[in-house]
Regions:
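Single conserved hydrophobic/aromatic residue that forms the stacking wall/gate
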Residues: 1-7, 194-203
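Acidic, glycine-rich active-site loops and adjacent beta-strand->loop/helix elements
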Residues: 86-91, 116-122, 161
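A glycine-rich phosphate/pyrophosphate-binding beta-strand-loop-alpha-helix module
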Residues: 47, 95-151
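General beta-strand structural signal in soluble alpha/beta enzymes
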Residues: 83-84, 112-116, 137-140, 155-157, ...
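Acidic, glycine/proline-rich low-complexity segments that act as flexible tails and inter-domain linkers
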Residues: 4, 8-93, 108
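Phosphate/diphosphate-binding glycine-rich loops and adjacent basic-rich segments that engage nucleotide
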Residues: 143-196
């Protein structure tokens, strides 16, 4: 609608002027993106804003809330799983360290539910690695449980579990730069986790 277009332009102008969004505004924007209310150019503009300035805690929290509210929930809590995550896009052209770590931990008998995506800024996103190893992405809870029981690991391909991440994936890939979605990824595993250490944890 015309009113909606005006609102979206107003939001972008505010961001271009280095103003910050409130938590509820951030949540609404990501919900609208998932519902297809923003076109590719508008999404690219939004991503670019956060390359020009730091994202605020309130904005990040709002985006995270939207992703968690829209997620396809996965209950594997009986396994008390962990996820080992990184933000990706370090520009070092290294192998995918966090995904390799998941194999090691699962091989040692600990239960891992890895949540990841194709690389937007590299060739070795978690989904790229898993696909190369013959993993078939699924949202079927019975198949995920069988994977946990037999291998101590299940893989959640992000676009299958969140419409917003699916909507922005081609734009992120086209831009080829780190964005706030790199920060959000480790925070929005759709499975209820026992714990989620990251490579930067002092532990």
């Amino acid at each position: 609608s015309a009113a909606s277009d005006v609102y979206k332009r107003q939001i972008l102008y505010r961001l271009f002027e280095h103003q910050y969004l409130g938590r509820d505004e951030a949540r609404t924007i990501l919900q609208n993106i998932a519902e297809g209310k923003y076109n590719d150019s508008q999404i690219a503009s939004l991503i670019t804003v956060y390359l020009m300035r730091n994202i605020s805690v309130e904005e990040l929290a709002g985006f995270r809330e939207a992703l968690l509210e829209m997620r396809v929930p996965v209950d594997l809590s009986e396994f008390k799983p962990i996820d080992i995550v990184g933000t990706g896009g370090d520009g070092k052209n290294t192998f995918n360290i966090s995904t390799a770590s998941c194999f090691v931990v699962a091989g040692a008998g600990y239960n891992v539910v890895k949540h990841g995506n194709y690389g937007a800024t590299s060739v070795s996103g978690a989904s790229n690695v898993m696909e190369q190893h013959g993993v078939k992405f699924t949202a079927d809870i019975d198949r995920l449980r069988r994977s946990m029981e037999s291998c101590h690991i299940a893989y959640l391909h992000a676009p299958l579990f969140n419409p917003a991440l699916k909507a922005v994936a081609p734009i992120r890939k086209s831009l080829g730069v780190r964005s706030f979605f790199n920060m959000l990824g480790p925070l929005v595993n759709p499975c209820l986790l026992y714990t989620s250490p990251s490579p930067r944890d002092k532990r």
